[in-house]
Amino acid sequence: MPAPIEVGRICVKTAGREAGKYCVVVDIVDENFVIITGPKDVTGVKRRRCNIKHLEPTPEKVDIDRGASDEEVKEALEEAGLLDLMKEGIVSGS
């Protein structure tokens, strides 16, 4: 069973120009859309609304508040030791 999409969940974008890049869910809009961020200076994914069908959740999750700023997300990634994973960028598809 895949990990649930929730605030703080690290996901991989599966569609669009940012496909294959890691992002973090910072807010839930409704049952179909969430707000994600890279943050942009880490992964290149800017803060935007995204359809959950275009996200693949990973088992990793960071402890952030709903609506957290990019700086707070980056700080949480550093504390969790996941900043290097996020900077790797594009996930190889198979």
Curated annotation (Swiss-Prot):
Domain of life: Archaea
GO cellular component assignments: cytosolic large ribosomal subunit
Protein known as: Large ribosomal subunit protein eL14
Keyword terms of this UniProt record: Ribonucleoprotein, Ribosomal protein
Entry annotated with the keyword Ribonucleoprotein: yes
Family: Belongs to the eukaryotic ribosomal protein eL14 family.
Entry's Gene Ontology molecular function annotations: RNA binding; structural constituent of ribosome
Iron-sulfur listed as a keyword: no
